[in-house]
Amino acid sequence: MKRKNNKFIEISIAFILGVALGIYGQNPDYFTNLINQKSLASSAPKIKHYNISELLRSKVSTCFTPPAGCTKFIANQIDRAEESIYMQAYGMSDALITTALINAQMRGVKVRILLDRSNLKQKFSKLHELQRAKIDVGIDKVPGIAHNKVIIIDRKKVITGSFNFTAAADKRNAENVIIIEDRELAESYLQNWLNRKASN
C-alpha cells in the first residue's frame, strides 16, 4: 500500500512538472507575470473618500461624444496651463492634443507623460513626436495595460473619463470627459501618477 502511494506521488509530481515546463516553454514570462499580478492583487487599493458637498463646490465641466468636439475642449484646457501638466494615457495619437502639449512645453510648462506600452508599436502614436519636442515621456510597464486617461493641470485641475486621446474617441466613439477643479482631488491623482512613474 505504501509503495502504491509513493508511486502515485511520483506520477503526480512528474505530471505537475510536465505542465509547468510546457507552460514555461511556450511563455517564459508566464510565471514572472503571474507573481507580479498576484503582488499587485494582494496590495490593498488606495481608496480615498470625498465629501460630496465639498466636491459640489468645485468647478465641474463635462463633454460627451458624439458629436465631435471634446478634443478641442481638452486642448483648450492644456493651452491654459501655467506651471505643470501630468498625463496618463492609453491611446495617444491625436494631433491637436499633441500640438497643445508641445506648445505648453515650449512656453515653459513642465510636461510629463506616462503611456501604455502599446504606443511603442502603434503606427499613429505621437510618442516619438513628443519625445522629439524634449517632453519627458515614460512607459507604464504594468503587467496588464495602462488604461488611465488622466491629465492633471497646475496641480489643481483633473481631466479624466473614458476618452482616449485619439481621433477615434472624438469622431467615432461614444465617450465622456469630465474636468474637476479641486486641489485635493488633483493631488490624489498626481500622487497616483508619481507612484506609477516610480514603479517604472
UniProtKB/Swiss-Prot annotation:
Its EC number is 3.1.4.4. It is found in: Secreted. Residues 142-169 form the PLD phosphodiesterase domain. The keyword Disulfide bond does not apply. Its main location: secreted. InterPro entries: PLD-like_dom (IPR025202), PLD_domain (IPR051406), PLipase_D/transphosphatidylase (IPR001736). GO terms for cellular component: extracellular region. Residues 1-25 form the signal peptide. The active site is at H147, K149, D154. GO terms for biological process: lipid catabolic process; phosphorus metabolic process. It is an enzyme of class 3 (hydrolase). It catalyses: a 1,2-diacyl-sn-glycero-3-phosphocholine + H2O = a 1,2-diacyl-sn-glycero-3-phosphate + choline + H(+). Keywords: Hydrolase, Lipid degradation, Lipid metabolism, Secreted, Signal, Virulence. PROSITE patterns: PLD. GO terms for molecular function: phospholipase D activity; RNA endonuclease activity, producing 5'-phosphomonoesters. The keyword Secreted applies. Homodimer. Belongs to the phospholipase D family. Could be a virulence factor. This is Phospholipase D. It comes from Rickettsia felis (strain ATCC VR-1525 / URRWXCal2).
